[in-house]
């Protein structure tokens, strides 16, 4: 990230897509990691967060559902949270366009009373597979250092069986 991109110099927080081919060529351990699960990378990105405003409640865009996140830097003091939202509320949520041009649910209008916490991972220390269509957020609880950086990967052959 430091040697091959200007991402850390950018004031833009949140998602930053990477050149997957270049990334896999320069980080052979990633190739080995994904090969052991027979996964073929479709997209790769890093998420950069320095505050609770950077990765608020959201649902990732389709078509890919199963994603793998790998901690890169400064995940201590951060919490990944997944929520259930009442269907009557979710059905009324307006759509907006994200900065990549995708039509996405605008979950900033969902009242906190309509959220039920389903799962929480604090201080992510190892890779995790998750369903990116479940509403989720990243919350700064007591960050030890900034910025929080996590690599995210989607696959041509989604690891749906790992979601079980």
Where are these regions (language model features)?
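Catalytic core of non-heme Fe(II) oxygenases with the double-stranded beta-helix
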Residues: 39-127
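Short Gly/Pro-enriched loop/turn and capping motifs at secondary-structure junctions
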Residues: 75-77, 135-137, 156-158
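Short, surface-exposed loop and linker segments with low hydrophobicity and enrichment for Pro/Ser/Thr
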Residues: 7-8, 139-148
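A short hydrophobic beta-strand segment most commonly corresponding to one strand
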Residues: 66-71, 127-131, 144-162
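Active-site or metal-binding loop neighborhoods of secreted/extracellular toxin and effector enzymes
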Residues: 113, 138, 160-164
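Generic hydrophobic, helix-prone segments enriched in Leu/Val/Ile
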Residues: 34, 80, 118, 159-164
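Signature of the catalytic double-stranded beta-helix
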Residues: 1-63
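Short beta-strand His + acidic residue motifs that chelate non-heme Fe in jelly-roll/DSBH
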Residues: 55-58, 130-143
């Amino acid at each position: 990230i430091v040697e091959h991109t200007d991402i850390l110099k950018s004031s833009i927080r949140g998602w930053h897509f990477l050149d997957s081919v270049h990334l896999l060529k320069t980080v052979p351990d990633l190739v080995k990691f994904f090969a052991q699960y027979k996964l073929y990378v479709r997209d790769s990105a890093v998420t950069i967060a320095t505050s609770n405003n950077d990765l608020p409640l959201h649902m990732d865009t389709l078509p890919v559902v199963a994603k793998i996140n790998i901690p890169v830097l400064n995940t201590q003091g951060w919490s990944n949270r997944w929520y259930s939202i009442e269907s009557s509320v979710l059905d009324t949520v307006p759509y907006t366009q994200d900065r990549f041009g995708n039509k996405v649910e605008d979950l900033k209008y969902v009242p906190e009373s309509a959220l039920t916490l389903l799962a929480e991972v604090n201080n992510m220390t190892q890779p995790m597979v998750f369903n990116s269509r479940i509403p989720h957020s990243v919350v700064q609880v007591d960050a030890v250092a900034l910025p929080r950086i996590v690599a995210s990967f989607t696959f041509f052959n989604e690891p749906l069986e790992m979601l079980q």
